[in-house]
């Protein structure tokens, strides 16, 4: 059974350990990640980008695949299924499909709109016992066809988003996805 990532991460913080979040793109990756998490007796977060969700024929398919694999492989460690860098509509689809955690990437919206959309999602996830991550300031590099410049988030904007009741905040700190180029001016 999928679990909400919030409790998993609270336990990790209290126990002074990390929880890996690995993006899945197919059955083979998912199986390898689940088996390794079980072997290491480690909770795990399975991330799914919108592109990967489409590739795997939809979010309901992803939920069915993960739940089926957890049952067939006798996975007993906590597993959260998390939408990674989701649009507002993608978040709603993942709620409906049965994900246990979503990330709303509203970093490309003006801050007032990001806050308003995030606030709406806070109410929705509370009704479904899900966790919600929100982003302020873009993460640089390229992931799933999305290219960011790696800006630093405004601390006041971070506080505004955090104050609406999210579980986790993803704040751009000049970092990027992928390999750092030799001339990178961030961190």
Predicted segments, located by residue:
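Alpha/beta enzyme core
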Residues: 3-15, 26-52, 57-76, 85-187
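Boundary/entry segment of secreted carbohydrate-active catalytic domains
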Residues: 17-20
């Amino acid at each position: 059974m999928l679990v909400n990532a919030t409790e998993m991460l609270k336990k990790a913080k209290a126990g002074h350990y990390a929880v890996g979040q690995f993006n899945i793109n197919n059955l083979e990756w998912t199986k390898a990640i689940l088996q390794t998490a079980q072997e290491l007796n480690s909770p795990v977060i399975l991330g799914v980008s919108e592109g990967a969700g489409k590739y795997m024929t939809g979010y309901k398919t992803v939920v069915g695949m993960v739940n089926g694999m957890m049952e067939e492989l006798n996975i007993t460690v906590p597993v959260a299924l998390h939408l990674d860098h989701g649009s507002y509509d993608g978040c709603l689809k993942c709620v409906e499909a049965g994900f246990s955690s979503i990330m709303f990437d509203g970093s490309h919206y003006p801050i007032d709109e990001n806050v308003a959309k995030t606030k709406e999602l806070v109410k929705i996830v509370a009704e479904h016992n899900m966790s919600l991550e929100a982003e302020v300031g873009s993460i640089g590099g390229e992931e799933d066809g999305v290219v960011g410049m790696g800006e630093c988030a405004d601390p006041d904007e971070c506080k505004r988003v955090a104050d609406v009741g999210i579980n986790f905040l993803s704040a751009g700190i000049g970092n990027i996805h992928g390999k750092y180029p030799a001339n990178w001016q961030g961190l």
